[in-house]
Amino acid sequence: MFSFENLGVYQKARILVREVYKLQNKFPTEERYALGGQIRRSITSVTSNIAEGSGRDSNKDKAHFCVIAFESLMEAFSQLQNAQDLGYISINEVENLRPQFEEISKMLSGLKSSFEKKL
């Protein structure tokens, strides 16, 4: 097992990836490759950057990848709101995921801080 697989933030982000994928499947066919593709890229970037950062040698680099993961998380949430504004998903579907986004954002911030304290 790789070290990142033991991180709670990584495990929670994996669950969120699955939930977001389910939502984007509701998009109209023509949007599954445009907005849907962008949402898929941004949400999978969260787990990818957590994993990549864990493989870095320096705590500075590890903290930086937490920032990138956080930015991708915010991007994905914004895109879900756009999809809601366009009528592809409901406000309830977006708001039901908000607690997961908030929890993961706090966990990423805490992980980043823990690496920065070691600098």
Predicted regions span which residues?
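Short, C-terminally biased terminal segments at protein or domain edges
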Residues: M1-L119
